[in-house]
């Protein structure tokens, strides 16, 4: 759902499975008792008529985000009721929440870091040796929904042979990065 009124009481149906995106966002930016300081999460909304819309959440700038799906859904609802900015332009809608037109390829073009494309049918992510100059700030992950992404950009890696929900993948990736587990890039 890229524009219109987001039904907060029916995010799993009337909002085109916005509940899945909200859980992924929450897994990306929230810890047990706070907000991660080193995460940018960009969701790409393709639902409905019209072009794709991007909403970017910058964790160290966020204010008023709470660990409750409807509250986070309300932040998204406030963005999508606004007119969409042109492709390639970001408009700050509230602290740490940016709105812009664009698609996955445009987003990846903006990132200046190695990109890992999560795909259950690829080599495992968590084996190998970390590069000596590895930094969390210098890696990006992309994932889709219940099927592989159409984009072939990024290094394909797997978290296992089963297709997992996006928010679970994000939690696993955070664990691997937080614990310094060796990644196969």
Give residue ranges: language-model regions.
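Post-transcriptional modification and biogenesis factors for structured RNAs
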Residues: 1-185
């Amino acid at each position: 759902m890229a524009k219109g009124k987001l039904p907060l009481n029916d995010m799993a149906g009337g909002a085109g499975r916005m509940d899945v995106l909200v859980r992924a966002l929450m897994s990306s930016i929230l810890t047990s008792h706070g907000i991660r300081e080193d995460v940018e999460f960009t969701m790409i909304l393709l639902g409905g008529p019209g072009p794709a819309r991007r909403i970017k959440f910058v964790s160290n700038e966020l204010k008023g985000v709470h660990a409750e799906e409807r509250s986070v859904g309300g932040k998204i609802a406030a963005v999508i009721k606004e007119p969409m900015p042109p492709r390639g332009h970001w408009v700050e809608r509230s602290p740490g929440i940016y709105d812009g037109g664009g698609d996955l390829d445009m987003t990846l073009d903006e990132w200046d870091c190695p990109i890992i494309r999560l795909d259950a049918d690829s080599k495992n992510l968590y084996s190998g040796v970390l590069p000596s100059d590895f930094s969390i700030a210098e890696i990006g992950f992309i994932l889709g929904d219940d099927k592989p992404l159409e984009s072939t950009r990024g290094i394909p890696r797997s978290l296992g042979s089963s297709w997992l929900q996006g928010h679970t993948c994000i939690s696993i990736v955070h664990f691997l990065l937080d614990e310094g587990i060796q990644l196969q890039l």
